[in-house]
């Protein structure tokens, strides 16, 4: 084997190994990738049932229903489309109708989600950036309202 052939063999071998490694990493992470949707986006381009995703919006007033045990049904809305959510577990203390929420779970129907986790906004000025962006995109964002998007990566002020 000449020097040039050996060098080409090493380069193609390294590229092949790198390709296999990237493929294995993507395969391993495919179960952890979760896409974020607003109710209108979900209605327009719904993924297949069984897909894992996050849905953000507001809890529709009057939609909260509690069953025996810890099962809760509610509707997440962006004031254009609604998504029915079923969650079994303890809701966050700040979970209320009319408040911002992000739910993560499995799509069981076109507009039905079985949630594994529910995140509620934590104070009167905070709303997850994804929810705020989705509400702005739908034209229902109120700039003078109390819902302000979180700044990503912003540090909390130091108290001395």
UniProtKB/Swiss-Prot annotation:
Residues 140-160 are annotated as: Disordered. It is found in: Cell inner membrane. Heme binds at residues 122, 126. The chain crosses the membrane at residues 8-28. GO terms for cellular component: plasma membrane. SUPFAM superfamilies: Heme chaperone CcmE. GO terms for biological process: cytochrome complex assembly. Residues 29-160 are periplasmic. InterPro entries: CcmE, CcmE-like_sf, NA-bd_OB-fold. It comes from the Bacteria. Belongs to the CcmE/CycJ family. This is Cytochrome c-type biogenesis protein CcmE. It comes from Beijerinckia indica subsp. indica (strain ATCC 9039 / DSM 1715 / NCIMB 8712).
